[in-house]
């Protein structure tokens, strides 16, 4: 029964996204064509994988007056490396900047009514921010990673963000990646009972032990819990830790994060105990998805949660807000 529900969940959650991506025209950017730099997703964050030159390089496609003009500047020989791409056509302009490998700014400005202004920001250590439109009709979405953003705001991402990200790296294939990652996530959720966070609590306490070998062993065991413990570790405030605990936890985070590009299997292992992903699914339009998410989150509290997946949108919104408050306090 759960497996049938999982399959239905997959279809409902991502069939529209896959259709949209399959039908989208491919217009490879100058940035992608020249391949002077490659990008990767590491735990849902965009970063530069490499820059193929230690020098500053520039390129232009199109001349003034042409329908499409593109510019590209790659700075690999500066203290702070950067990638700057610009694109202008009769409908508007796009500017993409990647600074120091992981600070991403994307802006789309419109000159035609069919184009909507878009702003995307990725800054280290803070949530991503996606803004759609201007004025009173604008929408703003916040999420810790791109995968969270795709779940919490699928329509906004499909229509406005993903076409811009394809200018960076057309090979990312978001629709296919999301579908496969969700399949893996459902499998992991069936077997998960949020046990990693329980194990992590006692190990974190040992990181402030007066015995050096105890601290070393606890740090090693934290790393052995795998990438799935990262969402919990990222919730822990430095103010609740000693300096020794802070230092060792940061070493664990860095090692677990690594520089490995995201795969469906890695995404599932990482997100299976991530509360924000499952809270987002409680607000989904489709009932089977809400039911599955509520069942999985109940494992977090070790009892059913105060949530009615068949309630009205307003009732569910209020229930999710209360659940979110409970999670923050625990």
PLM feature spans:
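An exposure/low-complexity boundary signal
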Residues: 15-16, 214
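Extended repeat-based scaffolds of very large eukaryotic assembly and lipid-transport proteins
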Residues: 23-330
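Bacterial N-terminal signal peptides
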Residues: 7-15
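Sec/Tat signal peptide C-region and signal peptidase I cleavage site
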Residues: 17-21
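Bacterial N-terminal signal peptides that target proteins for export
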Residues: 1-6
